[in-house]
């Protein structure tokens, strides 16, 4: 399976998870559903980050045009980690503490995911990664999933 196809499938899976999580939220939240996206938008992995951004944007645009999730639009908040673990940690902290997201799609670099998942877990934030392949991520958190 090509890397680009994995990103596309990963984006679809995260959107499905957003729908599931949002459907089970109590009490009802008003306003957009904020979803963080950490990707290498610059640096050595920028081409993958750009593809991931385009795929996620198209998927969310389609969902929002069809009424969003339970009538709420999805709003994406992007952070560039440049495939650098320290920048992944900073990005995760910003998404949690400033943007107040409860779901993060971390698209590529295993080292960044390994560094940032513990922060997300401590804060009750779900993380999905479409490319993290490190064996160190197996059973790392009940709030972490990867695929396909």
Where in the sequence are the language-model features?
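Mature, Sec-exported extracytoplasmic domains of Gram-positive
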Residues: 43-52, 63, 91, 118, ...
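Short, well-structured alpha-helical segments in soluble
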Residues: 77-78, 82-102
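Extracytoplasmic "Venus flytrap"
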Residues: 36-55, 79-86, 108
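Short, low-complexity disordered leader/linker segments with a strong preference
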Residues: 1-34
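Short beta-strand elements in bilobed, periplasmic/extracellular small-molecule ligand-binding domains
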Residues: 69-82, 140-144
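Signal peptide-proximal N-terminal region
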Residues: 53-76
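Extracytoplasmic ligand/sensor domains, especially the bilobed periplasmic-binding protein
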Residues: 100-148
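Sec/Tat-exported extracytoplasmic proteins
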Residues: 39-45, 59-60, 64-67, 96-99, ...
């Amino acid at each position: 399976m090509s890397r680009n196809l994995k990103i596309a499938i990963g984006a679809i899976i995260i959107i499905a998870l957003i729908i599931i999580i949002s459907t089970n939220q109590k009490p009802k939240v008003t306003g957009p559903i904020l979803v963080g996206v950490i990707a290498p938008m610059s640096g050595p992995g920028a081409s993958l980050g750009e593809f991931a951004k385009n795929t996620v944007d198209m998927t969310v645009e389609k969902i929002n045009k069809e009424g969003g999730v339970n009538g709420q639009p999805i709003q994406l908040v992007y952070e560039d980690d440049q495939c650098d673990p320290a920048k992944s940690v900073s990005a995760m902290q910003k998404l949690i503490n400033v943007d107040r997201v409860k779901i993060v799609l971390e698209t590529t670099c295993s080292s960044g995911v390994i560094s940032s998942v513990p922060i997300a877990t401590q804060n009750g934030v779900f993380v999905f990664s479409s490319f993290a392949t490190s064996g160190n991520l197996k059973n790392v958190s009940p709030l972490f999933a990867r695929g396909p």
